Amino acid sequence: MTARKIFVTTALPYANGNFHIGHIMEYIQADTWVRAQRMQGNAVNFVGADDAHGAPIMIAAEKAGKTPQQFVADIAAGRKQYLDGFHIAFDNWSNTDSPENHELSQQIYLDLKAAGFIETRTIEQFFDPEKNMFLPDRFIKGECPRCHAKDQYGDNCEVCSSVYAPTDLINPYSALSGAKPVLKTSEHFFFKLSDPRAVEFLTEWTQNGQHVQPEVAAKIKEWFGTRTNPDGTTSEGLDDWDISRDAPYFGIEIPDAPGKYFYVWLDAPVGYLASLKNLLNKRGEDYDAYMADPQLEQYHFIGKDIITFHTLFWPAMLKFSGRKTPTKICVHGFMTVNNGEKMSKSRGTGLDPLKYLALGMNPEWLRYYLGAKLNGKNEDIDFNPEDFMARVNSDLIGKYVNIASRAAGFIFKRFGGKLGEVSADGQALLAQLREQAGPIVAAYEARDTARAVRETMLLCDRVNSYVDANKPWELAKQEGMEARLQDVCTTCIEAFRILTIYLKPILPQVAAEVARFLIVPPEQFAEVAQPLGAGHQIGQYQHLMQRVTQEQLDALFEPPAPAVEKVIPGGEEIAPTITIDDFAKVDLRIAKIVKCEAVEGSTKLLRLTLDVGEGQTRNVFSGIASMYKPKDLQGKLTVMVANLAPRKMKFGLSEGMVLAASHADEKAHPGIFVLEPFPGAQPGMRIH
């Protein structure tokens, strides 16, 4: 059989935080599938990357005092401990700000443009008047225009999975400031997903039964025609896709369009190809030749929350830019806890991957448990601590690991570590185990690891029944039964080897330890057909795995201790200590507000005309319009910084600063309070 050539990816994690258990579940699922493919002799390139672009990262980097590139690099530096910890073996890990991704994204765009799939339109776009910037989709929230779910993002609804323009939202608000955004016009670039060519292709591609699971295809089908929303309204057809964003933005510039950048969801999936190209470049291999091979298969493992981008936009981008489309999009559900409850760290139902490892919990316990749950369908899986303990302790250790421990000691001590001949009853048992190789490999192929585990555990039951029937511990006590003891124990070791091969994609570390114990090279599925044989030398058995304890599970799900809120006056720390000389540099004066008026074009500022006793007035702008009307301030005394350098503003020159008090968290503690001296103070008096 000719070896298959396969390219595999997982969804790109957004580079603004650590991995969560959902990431780890997906990576374990994909890693297991990749290992199963390699155990069939197939050539697989398995790549991942960080999704590095977008306004959220740009804003987070600014808050952290870093460049976006350094912010992403710091996040990426923490990935290895997770991947190594759970035995997840990517061939390459890159990020979407790589030179390869810039090059490929821009070329795909140009190819789509040449094919007539890109057009420009002047659109109205939301702008935050307080932050003075166009708002990215994820920083606009409001009511979904399709199903009317509240607090949905500006690009897609997490309830009904609809994709729409931010301007379609009902009652939108800025997630940055809470302000109601205003509409401003801007020229944007659109991918014409509604083009009849795209609709025809996507209809066939998503509904032909080859590329997505049936339940996913059924959901996608709703998006092509008229569909009824939960509130009774209807929506129809595929919409064109806005693929551009305005500066300031951290991303990839659109060719020949200064100040315009690709929307993150255009260049993010291209990151799959870019990470592969980066890998092949390191190896000195030709990326274009690799991708041009008609036998190449392309698989993407993703969560159900990003189906739209991977089953509509991504295949259409590839198809109409002249590239290979995915062989299959493999969609999984979410992980819940305790019979469907959403995970929550504060309630003690969150599963923190690093905490799991820090508690000394075996990563292959989790790999096995997830393997026993994942079935290749787009279904949520539930983590139940009691079920976890039972499956690990009773099944994995009690049924599988203990087979070796019940036989290996006798072989090593009584027969010098050499296997013997297997009699007819043992051969019959081993034949039954070997007969299941095809179905188990097929289960792995279908990503139905639950079936692969279930079938393997049934085989473990047969082997344990054989052990119980033949009682090697009693044979060891009987004179003249050495040959039978060696026969029975050899059968157990041969069976254990077969079972280990079946579980190897899920338990790579255990399989490696078993290979050392059996003194065999790393084995593939086909090798179950060949016995180790009489005379084969094995090593001394070392215990493979400890049992899960209740204490570990209690600690894993222990809610964090309630945070003791530090008393911070006014919501912000007292500033660092200064000297009296430092303070003396600031010239604070009593000022009279001679005139106060609103500033046209600003909702925040008031223009104050101040008498500071200089014989002439000063002009100062102050952001206090939300709390004071001009007539309320006119004639009042206040305090100003008189020696602050004048600042040129959009509305004029500001010649100082009026002092006002406010809480650091103005949303939670609204209010701005202008300082007013006691009666008797006169304009121009200095404050000491």
Swiss-Prot record:
Its EC number is 6.1.1.10. Its cofactor is Zn(2+). Residues 582-688 form the tRNA-binding domain. Keywords: Aminoacyl-tRNA synthetase, ATP-binding, Cytoplasm, Ligase, Metal-binding, Nucleotide-binding, Protein biosynthesis, RNA-binding, tRNA-binding, Zinc. Binds 1 zinc ion per subunit. InterPro entries: aa-tRNA-synth_I_CS (IPR001412), Anticodon_Met (IPR041872), Met-tRNA-synth_bsu_C (IPR004495), Met-tRNA_ligase_1 (IPR023458), Met-tRNA_synth (IPR014758), Methionyl/Leucyl_tRNA_Synth (IPR015413), MetRS_core (IPR033911), MetRS_Zn (IPR029038). It is found in: Cytoplasm. The keyword Phosphoprotein does not apply. One of its GO terms (molecular function) is tRNA binding. It is an enzyme of class 6 (ligase). Zn(2+) binds at C144, C147, C157, C160. One of its GO terms (biological process) is methionyl-tRNA aminoacylation. Its main location: cytoplasm. A motif ('KMSKS' region) lies at residues 342-346. GO terms for cellular component: cytosol. It holds the Pfam family Anticodon_3. It catalyses: tRNA(Met) + L-methionine + ATP = L-methionyl-tRNA(Met) + AMP + diphosphate. NCBIfam families: metG, metG_C_term, PRK00133.1. Homodimer. Belongs to the class-I aminoacyl-tRNA synthetase family. MetG type 1 subfamily. PANTHER family: METHIONINE--TRNA LIGASE, METHIONINE--TRNA LIGASE, CYTOPLASMIC. This is Methionine--tRNA ligase. The lineage of its organism: Bacteria, Pseudomonadati, Pseudomonadota, Betaproteobacteria, Burkholderiales. The gene is metG.
